[in-house]
Amino acid sequence: MKGLRGHNKKSFWGNTRLSDLLWPVTLLPGLISAYQPVYLGSRQSSPFLPPQIPLGDSPPLSDTHEFTLRHIFHRGTYQDPDLHRRLDITPDTRLRAVSDAGIESDVVTPNTPLVASSQPLIIERLADRRLSVIEEHLVTARSSGSAVALSPSDWVMDTLPGPNVTEKKTVVALAMMTANDYIEVPGTGDWQDIHGRFNHSGSFGWQGDGLRGHVYADKTNSTVVISLKGTSPALFDGEGTTTNDKINDNLFFSCCCGQGGSYLWRQVCDCQTTLYNANLTCIVEAMLDENRYYRASLDLYSNITEMYPNANVWLTGHSLGGAVSSLLGLTFGVPVVTFEAVPEALPAARLGLPSPPGHDSRYPQSRRNTGSYHFGHTADPVYMGTCNGVSSVCTWGGYAMESACHTGQMCVYDTVEDKGWRVGLSKHRINYVIANVLAGYDDVPPCAPEEECYDCELWKFFRSNGSEITTTTSATSTSTSTTTSRTSTCKTPGWWGCLDQTTTTETTSTSTSTSTCKTPGWFGCKDPTTTSDITSVPTITTTEPPMTSTTTCKTPGWFGCKDETTTQVIAPAATLTITEPPVTSTTTGKHLGRF
């Protein structure tokens, strides 16, 4: 038996060739690739790739990260709507920093790392955050006029690594990312077109149009920060993105696109109907145009997350860039830290962003666990929502900044009380804020949600889809008239008037008007049909009988009869006559004009 076992073992190895042993190794690449993460809905041929849900190992919830600038994305909007380019930062790339005033500095090499730490953060967000699914929700909200109603199973409560907003170093590092606005020195950077539909060979000034995002990543690519460029500082239309930023500001943060307020405000839509009345459907249509910053931010986010599918994404921004970052954070459920951001609850409600069960989508400022934190100070009128008065610099610059409510939590430095500062727009610039507020305080302020805040309380908004039927019923009026008449000839005159019968007539009429509009217009109904029914109550006529008096005198005197005898006869009782009047119905007008 022992020999048999030894023979069989020897025979097995003896008949095996080397190629037979190596063939499983040739299958390893295929087996390994088969276990690569696969994302549903990926479109390799499309330039706009959906953001992915990482399927790999989760990064630690608390850690320290050293971020460096990796890419600059530029998404065209107005002038070049098909433009989407990317600049990869290499050791040979030379950049110029652009200051708050739009002045270019000397050549810099942005290789100094920015250190920030993370901590566990709970966010309630959609379970399926693919771009295609998000687009379906937005389309539904656009067509129905309200955010799509989702079941509780469509939402998850996730704990993920978020920025440590209680640490001063982290807050300052994120603010530095929003302050860093770079352009490349010609010849030192190679912009890559994400798709080939834009011919930039003869284009000049394309960097002055669109939305720009700076992408920072840590050493392990486990955490990525996207910083969006905010509003240009110039107050009057000029070069760069100033005009486009003003259009987006007035479209997103005004009650009605710069209408209904100061004549200095730049009007960016025509949706107001009457005083403090506006067509909300018209406003939302303008906000969702493809050349708006929110639409451009969706494309930026989707392409960046395609490059880093397993990374944890943070968003940050200043002013308009902070507001757009917050809208992105609410859309995809990622952490957001903004600085001096414009109050963005108003556009969040109008865009129809999905809201968890138990929250009213019309008031996104009431949501909890959004993962968004808005840092600012009380001397900044933009952040506080007060830069809209007649004498404010925003108004004189054409900006209609009427929104007042933030989503998420506000982290407010009370510089008016602590430092005695006066409110002014000069204190809105990010470099001033970093030097005098973020670095000037020893600790960061506590963060808390904004309570009892409402936007555009004087306004009334209505939605239209071309099929409304508006019915208006007028008030009912009742009139009573009393008419006293006499016979044309008095047959029995008396000392104090005629003794003939007196007729009293009372008439009561009720008028009801009902107007039905099948095709409403901007300034009234185009084809109302008005029906007036006049119904009169029965006429009541009372006839009083005449009084008959007979006098007989037997012994007349100087001043009258000395022995008069008076006999008084009263006619039968009064006669009551009731007359039923006809009911009159009148229909007028089928096609009224605009007014």
Curated annotation (Swiss-Prot):
<feature type="glycosylation site" description="N-linked (GlcNAc...) asparagine">
    <location>
        <position position="199"/>
    </location>
</feature>
<keyword id="KW-0378">Hydrolase</keyword>
<keyword id="KW-0812">Transmembrane</keyword>
<feature type="transmembrane region" description="Helical; Signal-anchor for type II membrane protein">
    <location>
        <begin position="21"/>
        <end position="41"/>
    </location>
</feature>
<keyword id="KW-0472">Membrane</keyword>
<feature type="glycosylation site" description="N-linked (GlcNAc...) asparagine">
    <location>
        <position position="279"/>
    </location>
</feature>
<dbReference type="InterPro" id="IPR002921">
    <property type="entry name" value="Fungal_lipase-type"/>
</dbReference>
<dbReference type="InterPro" id="IPR050805">
    <property type="entry name" value="ATG15_Lipase"/>
</dbReference>
<dbReference type="GO" id="GO:0006660">
    <property type="term" value="P:phosphatidylserine catabolic process"/>
</dbReference>
<dbReference type="GO" id="GO:0032585">
    <property type="term" value="C:multivesicular body membrane"/>
</dbReference>
<keyword id="KW-0735">Signal-anchor</keyword>
<dbReference type="GO" id="GO:0034727">
    <property type="term" value="P:piecemeal microautophagy of the nucleus"/>
</dbReference>
<feature type="active site" description="Charge relay system">
    <location>
        <position position="319"/>
    </location>
</feature>
<feature type="glycosylation site" description="N-linked (GlcNAc...) asparagine">
    <location>
        <position position="303"/>
    </location>
</feature>
<feature type="glycosylation site" description="N-linked (GlcNAc...) asparagine">
    <location>
        <position position="164"/>
    </location>
</feature>
<keyword id="KW-0443">Lipid metabolism</keyword>
<comment type="subunit">
    <text>Binds to both phosphatidylinositol (PI) and phosphatidylinositol 3,5-bisphosphate (PIP2).</text>
</comment>
<dbReference type="GO" id="GO:0005783">
    <property type="term" value="C:endoplasmic reticulum"/>
</dbReference>
<dbReference type="GO" id="GO:0004620">
    <property type="term" value="F:phospholipase activity"/>
</dbReference>
<feature type="topological domain" description="Lumenal">
    <location>
        <begin position="42"/>
        <end position="595"/>
    </location>
</feature>
<dbReference type="GO" id="GO:0000425">
    <property type="term" value="P:pexophagy"/>
</dbReference>
<dbReference type="GO" id="GO:0005775">
    <property type="term" value="C:vacuolar lumen"/>
</dbReference>
<keyword id="KW-0072">Autophagy</keyword>
<feature type="topological domain" description="Cytoplasmic">
    <location>
        <begin position="1"/>
        <end position="20"/>
    </location>
</feature>
<keyword id="KW-0325">Glycoprotein</keyword>
<feature type="glycosylation site" description="N-linked (GlcNAc...) asparagine">
    <location>
        <position position="465"/>
    </location>
</feature>
<comment type="similarity">
    <text>Belongs to the AB hydrolase superfamily. Lipase family.</text>
</comment>
<keyword id="KW-1133">Transmembrane helix</keyword>
<feature type="glycosylation site" description="N-linked (GlcNAc...) asparagine">
    <location>
        <position position="221"/>
    </location>
</feature>
<dbReference type="GO" id="GO:0006624">
    <property type="term" value="P:vacuolar protein processing"/>
</dbReference>
<protein>
    <recommendedName>
        <fullName>Putative lipase atg15</fullName>
        <ecNumber>3.1.1.3</ecNumber>
    </recommendedName>
</protein>
<dbReference type="GO" id="GO:0046461">
    <property type="term" value="P:neutral lipid catabolic process"/>
</dbReference>
<dbReference type="Pfam" id="PF01764">
    <property type="entry name" value="Lipase_3"/>
</dbReference>
<dbReference type="GO" id="GO:0005774">
    <property type="term" value="C:vacuolar membrane"/>
</dbReference>
<dbReference type="GO" id="GO:0034496">
    <property type="term" value="P:multivesicular body membrane disassembly"/>
</dbReference>
<dbReference type="GO" id="GO:0004806">
    <property type="term" value="F:triacylglycerol lipase activity"/>
</dbReference>
<comment type="function">
    <text>Lipase which is essential for lysis of subvacuolar cytoplasm to vacuole targeted bodies and intravacuolar autophagic bodies. Involved in the lysis of intravacuolar multivesicular body (MVB) vesicles. The intravacuolar membrane disintegration by atg15 is critical to life span extension.</text>
</comment>
<keyword id="KW-0442">Lipid degradation</keyword>
<dbReference type="InterPro" id="IPR029058">
    <property type="entry name" value="AB_hydrolase_fold"/>
</dbReference>
<keyword id="KW-0967">Endosome</keyword>
